A protein has these predicted regions:
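Cyclic nucleotide-binding regulatory module and flanking cytosolic helices
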Residues: 1-29, 33-34, 172-173
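Alpha-helix boundary recognition
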Residues: 7, 24-25, 74, 98, ...
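A small-molecule sensor/coupling module
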Residues: 20, 93-94, 111-153
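Short, intrinsically disordered, mixed-charge
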Residues: 25, 29, 87-90, 118
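Cyclic nucleotide-binding regulatory domains
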Residues: 37-101
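A short hydrophobic beta-strand segment most commonly corresponding to one strand
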Residues: 103-108
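Phosphate-/nucleic-acid-contacting segments
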Residues: 145-174
């Protein structure tokens, strides 16, 4: 069942059927109800979630304990995974991911991924490469957005760091 669901996910199209089966063995189907937190900002590095249905919201805490919505992700969209950093990194989650509707997902635990890496499984290394490319693309986009935010603030004659920070958090998209 998990392997069949992975087969239809664009993010995993580079895997062979056998490699998808390897991931499916250590994965599980999970469901989150609307409002339920899937990943909590600052939380321990955790699992990769492959969204198969539903919609999630990605938000970040900003000044004064406020939360800023960064993105909404539909399971049917091009980006159908959340939690990529949790597989590769050691730092806490950079944002909160919350179910905006009922969400069904495939959970690939960090433990499963790390075991596959330690066993030298090519599928895990291929997934690492795919995640690295995705993160590099996002970093490039973020750099462009930061430069644009600075230019806009300079055009308006603003030099206040707080104004820049708020502008960055408002316009930053995951």
């Amino acid at each position: 069942m998990v392997e069949e669901r992975l087969q239809g996910v664009r993010f995993f199209e580079f895997l062979t059927e056998e490699e998808r089966e390897e991931f499916a063995e250590g994965s599980e189907l999970v469901t989150f109800e609307a409002g339920e937190v899937i990943i909590e900002e600052g939380g321990e590095p955790g699992s990769l979630f492959v969204l198969t249905s539903g919609r999630v919201e990605v938000s970040k805490s900003i000044t004064g304990g406020r939360e800023r919505l960064l993105a909404e992700i539909e399971a049917t969209g091009e980006r159908t995974v959340v939690g990529e950093r949790g597989l590769l990194g050691e730092s806490g989650a950079s944002a909160t991911v919350r179910a905006a509707s009922r969400v069904e997902a495939i959970k690939i635990p960090r433990k499963t991924f790390r075991r596959m890496i330690s066993e030298g499984r090519p599928a895990a290394f291929r997934l690492s490469y795919r995640i690295a490319r995705t993160l590099a693309h996002r970093l490039t986009r973020l750099d462009e957005e930061v430069v644009e935010a600075i230019r806009e603030l300079e055009r308006r004659g603003e030099t206040d760091l707080e104004a820049f920070r708020d502008k960055l958090m408002t316009d930053w998209a995951v």
